[in-house]
Amino acid sequence: MDQIVLALQTRIALSEPTLLEGSVRVVQTKQGPALAQGAHRVRQIQFDLERCTVYLAERSREAQPMIYSSAEQWQNAPHKRVVLFGMSGLGKTYMSNILRDTGSWFHYSVDYRIGTHYMGDYITDSIKRKAMDVPYLRELLLSDSIYLASNITFENLAPLSTYMGKPGAEANGGVPFQEYRKRQEQHRRSEIAALLDTPEFIGRAEEIYQYDHFICDCSGSICEVVDPFDRDDPVLKSLSETALLVWIKGNAAHTQELVQRFDKAPKPMYYHPDFLIEKWTQYLADQTLQEHQVNPDSFIRWIYAEALAHRQPRYEAMANWGVTVDASEVARAKSEEDFSALIGQALATKAAP
């Protein structure tokens, strides 16, 4: 695990073979589409001792256009629009809540939009299926005597995560893998739709509710539903044309904390379909298990560190569409002024030669 954290934190120059000797070896190289004039390469690194996979990338040297080109333009903007992205637990919702509480920022939660608008019927139907197994509730439900619905809030997304579930033995609360993949695909489509709704909500926030500023609080899985290596990705183009993308970047200590937190309370999450199938197949082979024998919590604990490593180069590529702030600095921000200064500094840093 320490080697994974180190690899995530360390900038490895892939053009220097000597840095790949010893504990790691290149097992696969993927050439992604060019970002502007620079190519973005992703390499899969496998640790010889721990059979863990780390994905690393060289960032494109060519940044994408942003709606704020300088710190001065940002500070003087009458309407500030920001899209926060990064791993769950690094401060997106924390900062969004601070800004929302000022009364001048509209808080658009992508997870909330997914759970209430796009996946609300799926969630409600799953609740009704369980209710139909209880004779007392079945009778009331069939006679329209009761109303069943989830109660999702910005702070409580349990209905959504419970519906997403964990793959594995049903006796242990798991979901059959094919059903799990279906729900993952539902989430993928829903997240893309919710992200594409952002410009509409920017307009509604200003025109209807008279908010001066807008903060979009993205799901941690945004990097899995867009192609950050494609400068023509429709979702990233839509977002970057209407708001400033801001990556909240963690370090090795943050990664270790996230892993420890997840180990204590493993929660469902979305994975890129190719990555999920690859890791599911690997887990079954390594553990010599059939699908119905998999302990759901054991599997998602095992895949979590792999998922962090898989997402890192995708976040890196997304950073070309905006700016980067450190998660430690976000944690120290206590006000709108702190946040505004943080973004201004990030813009100044990016503009520096």
Give the location of each predicted region.
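Glycine-rich phosphate-binding loop used to anchor ATP phosphates in small-molecule kinases
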Residues: 148-152, 156-238
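Conserved substrate/cofactor phosphate-moiety recognition/catalytic segment
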Residues: 101-138
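Hydrophobic positions on the alpha1 helix immediately C-terminal to the Walker A/P-loop
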Residues: 95
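NTP-dependent small-molecule kinase module
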Residues: 287-353
